[in-house]
Amino acid sequence: LSSSVVFVEKWPVLGRHGKAAEWLQVWSDLGRAARTIDAYGRGLSEFLIVCEREGVDPLTAGRADVAVFVRELTERPHRRGANVASIDSGAGLSNATIQQRLVPVRLFFGFLVEEGLRESNPVGRGRFVPGRHHGGTRRGLVPRFTKLPWIPDEQQWRDVLAVAADEPIRNRVMLALAYDAALRRAELCSLRTDDVDPGRRMLRVRAEVTKNRRERTVPYSAPTGVLLTGYLARRATISRARGPLFLSESRRNHGEPLTLWTWSKVVRRIALAAGVERFSTHTTRHLCLTDLARMGWELHAIATFAGHRNTDTTLQYIHLSDRDLADKLAKGMDHIHAWRVAMLTGAEATGTAK
């Protein structure tokens, strides 16, 4: 089946609005990640359903029509709380989620402008440009609230590590690498055996699994290297084949690549057991980058290490000074990372990973 047929099967409303399916096909053909396409398709289909209910033609919808969609998002029951009273009330869909839902709507209208089917974009922030998510200077419909990433305090981190110390070695090395190399969830779970260079203690993060589609190479510390060596020995008892680094040890999926969702469940279980409910798969990344900023790393060095395309994203982790990445790791990162991962590396492997 062609991807356009799959889109229509998954989101029938796109098939009722041909330009919508065509727009999503463009982004798919441009090589956007499957999860990005899924988010775009879901977000635009929600908007189109609201248009149909309100009797509005999406090709001629105006700012007021998009505002109706925003209102519905703000009134939608949140799975973890009550209905929202206002965009910044703290209940209902978060400001970030609403912004995400508006991205495909804005891009779709930008596409219609480029196609000559309308003159302006009611969502604002510029026109459809392949490879870019935004442009222009017009203010968006919904104010964007920028919050600093949450990171655990030292006691919370110790509580997490105390629980993690009793985890199987696979889970401990994943936590250690997630912190040590500031890896995103998808980057961590997608690591392959040939992405690891134990001799140089370096990881290759392949372009196809990164958020900005740019490959990078990042170092990891000696304590994590010791833990990784132990895991590789464990992995060899499951499979000697090259391929995905982290494998399932459950009866149902024994030897299969570990999924993003399984890793999320592992981290969630650890967080709840430690009494640190806000701890997530992305927390280790935030903590690592914050530590680098505290140690005086220069802005562009952190951006390179993190795989940030825009240094504006990196600014939240503070201002820095210049030096070579690997050299900085040896001189500065080790003494902070070593104690952070000591509890992970100090316990013998126990139990079976799921």
Task: Name each model-derived stretch.
Residues 221-276:
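Active-site/catalytic core of tyrosine-dependent DNA strand-transfer enzymes
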Residues 131, 185-186, 190-230:
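Conserved tyrosine-mediated DNA breakage-rejoining catalytic core shared by Y-recombinases
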Residues 152-185:
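Basic, Lys/Arg- and aromatic-enriched nucleic-acid-binding interface segment
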